[in-house]
Regions:
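Bacterial N-terminal signal peptides that target proteins for export
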Residues: 4-23
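Bacterial N-terminal signal peptides
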Residues: 20-32
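Alpha-helix termination/capping residues and helix-transition junctions
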Residues: 30, 58, 127-130
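C-terminal/domain-edge helix-coil "capping" segments
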Residues: 36-61, 163-230
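N-terminal segment of the mature soluble domain
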Residues: 63-135, 170, 199, 204-213, ...
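A mature extracytoplasmic/lumenal domain signature
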Residues: 68-70, 105-106, 137-140, 158-162, ...
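Surface-exposed short loop/turn segments
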Residues: 114-170, 184-185
Length: 230
């Protein structure tokens, strides 16, 4: 740094900070109107940092069973429930240290033998020798808004049961997504197939669910909107 720059920094530190912040804000506004959301994401990353801690962090060194029940699950396992279980499980394996997931085969076998309707999650956990059960109840699921738009919709209630608690099985954590929709204004169905959009929506939904257990980037939503061209 030159002598002039050092003198300027000593005399005008606050003014310089304001100039930098205002400059970044102005640049962000200009870029947002041009549709370059990834660039905004980078500005925000530099200004604020990236990670938010997990609300629930008691899965380390635990044997965890994940079960998802949808509107169709009363008749047995379905593709939607299977996809949600798989995606959430993959996120936990990637980010939670020393977690052990009960295999889906083992969970499905227990549920097949004991019934899919009115499931008892604590009994399930005991049956598969789990320390934790993550129960995901999914309803109102859809990926369409009329005949011309794709819009993902879902209601989710997620509950964590702690079976190894000193006082016996307890509810350790709950999380709800009520009438969750993405993208907010929909997306023309002509721009992607049903399968392509559903894969993207489920990945986003399950990432939101996994954020309850793993630290995550505070600006994930910007990236998703940019990918969809919002």
């Amino acid at each position: 740094m030159s002598p002039f720059q050092e003198t300027f920094m000593r005399k005008f530190p606050c003014e310089l900070g304001k100039i930098v912040v205002l400059g970044l804000v102005a640049a962000s506004l200009v870029i947002s109107f041009s549709g370059c959301l990834p660039m905004i994401d980078r500005f925000l990353y530099v200004m604020k940092g990236s990670e938010i801690p997990a609300p629930y962090n008691k899965l380390t060194n635990k044997r965890v069973a994940i079960v998802c029940v949808s509107d169709a699950s009363a008749y047995g396992p379905d593709n939607l429930s299977d996809s949600v279980t798989r995606l959430v499980g993959a996120a936990l394996l990637a980010k939670v240290k020393k977690i052990q997931l009960v295999s889906r085969t083992e969970v499905d076998k227990w549920v097949d033998e004991n019934g899919w309707d009115n499931m008892d999650y604590i009994s399930l956990g005991k049956g598969v020798k789990a320390d934790r059960v993550i129960a995901i109840e999914l309803s109102g699921y859809s990926i369409h808004e009329g005949k011309t738009l794709h819009k993902g919709k879902a209601n989710v209630v997620m509950t964590v049961y702690e079976l190894d608690h000193a006082k016996g099985p307890v509810v350790g954590h709950t999380y709800q997504l009520k009438e969750y929709e993405f993208p907010k204004n929909g997306r023309p169905a002509i721009q992607s197939t049903d399968r392509q959009f559903e894969e993207f929506f489920l990945a986003r939904l399950c990432r939101l669910l996994s954020h309850q257990f793993v630290k995550h980037d505070r600006f994930d939503s910007f990236a998703d909107e940019a990918i969809l061209g919002m």
